[in-house]
Amino acid sequence: MVIHLLLALVLASADQWPEFRGPSGQGHASDTGLPLDWSESRNVVWKTPVAGRGWSSPVVADGRIWLTTSTENTEGRRRGVSLRALAFESATGREIVNTEVFRVDRPEALNGKNSYASPTPIVDGDRIYVHFGAQGTAALTTAGDVVWRTRLDYQSQHGNGGSPIRYGDLLIVNCDGNGGEGDAYVVALDVKTGKTRWKATRRSPADQAYTTPLVIRVGERDELVSVGAYRAAAYDPANGKEIWRVSYEDGFSNVPRPVFGQGLVFIATGFQQPSLIAVRPDGTGDVTRSHVAWTLRRGAPLTPSPIVVGDQLFVVNDTGIATCVDAKTGTIQWQQRLGGTYSASPIYADGRIYFPSEEGVTTVIEPGTAFKQLAVNSLDGAILASMAVADRSFFIRTHSHLYRISDITAGGSRVRGFGGSRVRDAGAIQRQVAASICPGCL
């Protein structure tokens, strides 16, 4: 399994972004030559509409961008919500797959900020795995044909949130409901059949949470770090057996995905009184008193995931306060108000950190022990989905559109036939631009 994990990282080349937060699951991209700045009239290769409503983040592989979305029917006999998988050509933005995976006649109530299509899909070879929380999980071919479907039973108060991950031949999902005993658990499905291979029930008390797990390597063992309400736990990803757990008070409705660096796992504890704890992952049993290295109580995020770059940990909270701390000690090195509100997670690419806000504004900084802002970039639309990076481009989903952002002016000249307000939806001009920056893609 160690070999499989290493190969997955090595083989995930710069033209792939296969899951939420990229090949490592921690928001790091290997691409260079990425744009520093953009706007509606600058460095937009293409912009294409996305039907429906959804906050799943883009994933990219083999020249395609995959998303999920939900569309509502309010007329006629077929009322309810259609949960769909979409694919777009990376070179042109043209929609090439639009498949209904599930139809829900009476969908659950949502938090006003959430959607019925918030978990990010996984693309792995000739399979796409999509997850719509308690509404259903499925595997598709790259042509959009459904291979299998299953439904995971739990009661989610505000809709779905956490994304699935792939570990060998397992698809692993956090299912944190608030329906009482046994309604919060972690489950591993067989990727070929969708059948349950193992299930680990959360310890009591349990409540709703919306997180994505992370597999890390600690010594001679793999650990599946899964954050839930009131506690996080590490499991053996092969069989679901608990390795260690850490508890925290007033922690539920967790959203951020944990990250790992400098020998520590960084965990956001959730709603009400958010904090971020750094845990040494080499323990067993209850490590609450023995393995918490430090706690950040000021500026911890409710929704965006943290990111580790070198010796520093960077976070932005939901109200726009960015914080840099020493990852080993927890010492705050700077805090800065970026402005706006934040749900999307930051990424590190080409030596820079990108923080996209809900207002469509992305603040770019240079990582370091002093705050240094490099650019502020605006698009017309709300951003709650996290960015994808592939083919020396950013793929950004707003509430209504999908963008490909590239440094199309590299070398000092603008791409022929593209400029100013002439950005259009996918079409002939997109193919011309795409061919100039990606020869052979068409």
Which residues are covered by each model-predicted region?
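Noncatalytic, solvent-exposed loop/strand surfaces
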Residues: 13-417, 429, 433, 437-442
